[in-house]
Amino acid sequence: MMLPDWKIRKEILIEPFSEESLQPAGYDLRVGGEAYVNGKILDVKDSGGVTIPPKTYALVLTLERIKLPDDVMGDMKLRSSLAREGLIGSFAWVDPGWDGNLTLALFNASNESVELKYGERFVQIAFIRLEGPAKNPYRGNYQGSKHLALSKRKR
């Protein structure tokens, strides 16, 4: 079962919470303070945004910290306006028990640069209730992330 707006407000910890981001069946996550483009970590908050050049992969941190109960998971989709500009998002499930900011992977498939402004809504997350709590909720490598998290596979 997907959670409606009033249950999201009541049951899911989202910090900082924005009423404008709350949707009927989801929540619009905003561009946070860090990004990774062309091998460099960028301060998005200080610069006011991040530019993703054509044919370039990027990681973008969400402004929001999300904390999920052990019986709720998240499914994310890129906002359609950004897809129409050429962005493609590759997002994993957000497992039950997750707590932290999310690092999201984007690819600019277009021939034009795409700019994301700090605080701009860019991905919607929908929350899905499981039949019961997970026996093994998420407690993995990225739990508690507050900053951009690069892959831990290459370490």
Swiss-Prot record:
Binding site for dCTP: R79, S80, S81, L82, A83, R84, D95, Q124, Y138
Catalytic activity: dCTP + H2O + H(+) = dUTP + NH4(+)
InterPro entries: dCTP_deaminase, dUTPase-like_sf, dUTPase_trimeric
Pfam families, A to Z: DCD
UniProt keywords, alphabetically: Hydrolase, Nucleotide metabolism, Nucleotide-binding
Entry EC number(s): 3.5.4.13
Pathway: Pyrimidine metabolism; dUMP biosynthesis; dUMP from dCTP (dUTP route): step 1/2
GO BP terms in the entry: dUMP biosynthetic process; dUTP biosynthetic process
EC main group: hydrolase
GO MF term (any one): nucleotide binding
Protein function: Catalyzes the deamination of dCTP to dUTP.
Membership in a protein family: Belongs to the dCTP deaminase family.
HAMAP family (alphabetical): dCTP_deaminase
Record's subunit section: Homotrimer.
PANTHER family found in the cross-reference section: DCTP DEAMINASE
UniProt protein name: dCTP deaminase
Top-level taxonomy: Archaea, Methanobacteriati, Methanobacteriota, Thermococci, Thermococcales
Gene it is expressed from: dcd
